[in-house]
Amino acid sequence: MKKQLNVLISGGGTGGHIFPALSIANGIKERRPDANILFVGAENRMEMEKLPAAGYKIVGLPVSGFDRKHLLRNVKVVARLLKSMHLAKKILRDFKPDIAIGVGGYASGPMLKEAQKKGIPTLIQEQNSYAGVTNKLLAQKANAICVAYEGMERFFPADKILVTGNPVRQNILNCTLTPQQARQKFGLDPDRRTILVVGGSLGARTVNNCIAAALDT
């Protein structure tokens, strides 16, 4: 009889972190239905709503990102980080994960750092072609680093890199709509050229606004 697999997945703050994390969790569940998965995110961020809605348990840390424009505000950020590291230790004691997976974002920093101190195997998943600060800091002691693009040796130890591509949700992979059906679904004119604009993370709004403004001129 297999020992129950305890998997801790940490990260979040934006959809760019949350949805790959959700895809990883779903993939683990497909292969190991008995797996016990716990998410750790940042308090008051979107993961605290999205992941329970998908049927997963999540714990929030009071962690936040550093303010690079207003340095004095970082006093509170450091205090939150220290508190988060203390809470991370308790989470590890209570949950006893077999592996800790970090997908980037505020919460994965203290969570994976504490896991590494305890000798728990850690895996990092980097979605972008330019690595985030948190993942770069965790890379040296990570057991494996899954990336979406070639050439990530400039950020991470080459011997730890696995080029896996980005995790994709199964409902997207299962989509069978034809281009014509997709245009109809979104109310687009099938006789006009269709342009898809995809922005990443919180910068998507700026990209969308620029494109919309350009189309109006």
Describe every region a protein language model picked out.
Residues 12, 42-44, 63, 127, ...:
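Cofactor-binding loop segments of dinucleotide-utilizing enzymes, especially the Rossmann-like FAD-
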Residues 87-101, 107-123, 136-144:
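Glycosyltransferases and closely related glycan-assembly transferases
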Residues 17-28:
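Short amphipathic alpha-helix
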Residues 45-46, 50-54, 177-184, 188-217:
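Donor-nucleotide binding loops and adjacent catalytic segments primarily
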Residues 4-12, 30-80, 85:
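Conserved nucleotide-sugar phosphate-binding/catalytic loop shared by glycosyltransferases and other
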Residues 57, 116-180, 188-190:
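Active-site-proximal region of nucleotide-activated glycan assembly enzymes
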